[in-house]
Amino acid sequence: MNKVLFKLLILFFLTTTNTIGDENKMILKLKDGDVKIQLFPDVAPNHVERIKKLANDGAYNNVVFHRVIDGFMAQTGDVKFGNSSVESFDLRRAGMGGSDLPDLKQEFNNLPHDRGTLSMARSQDPNSANSQFFICFEPAPFLDRQYTVFGKVIEGMEFVDKIKRGDSNNNGSVDDPDKIISFKSE
């Protein structure tokens, strides 16, 4: 009897652990392939909650990578002006909008801006993150504890590397940009 109970407890623990972990994994579908992302609710709970809500509501679908700087990062997430499938799409204004939800208070943490890091974009105000985020191509330690890290690419970084780069003379602005096909929980 004790052995059966012990095995059931182990099975329950393993099942629960996998379920908890999976709810914080996302799939970012790009034109070249799927990117698997691990979210970090333990260090950025409000940012993770926002990303998951917007993603699972479909708000990021068809949103362009409006600012992409080679050797640095790819920025996306302007759900107001950057959604290429809606009437309000305006590539010239992409990067200036966000969602209708209130801005988030910063959740700066000790996670580094390494290759594959996902971090929230914001204005000069540290409490202005809303929907925009970026993925680092290379380490960017000068951003550490200045921007909220909320996730990391765990598979498919080679597809992020294929995102069309912007004009280095124009702060990475991209003509005819690549877009997020879909973004959702795994």
Located regions from the model:
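Cyclophilin-like peptidyl-prolyl cis-trans isomerases
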Residues: 9, 16-186
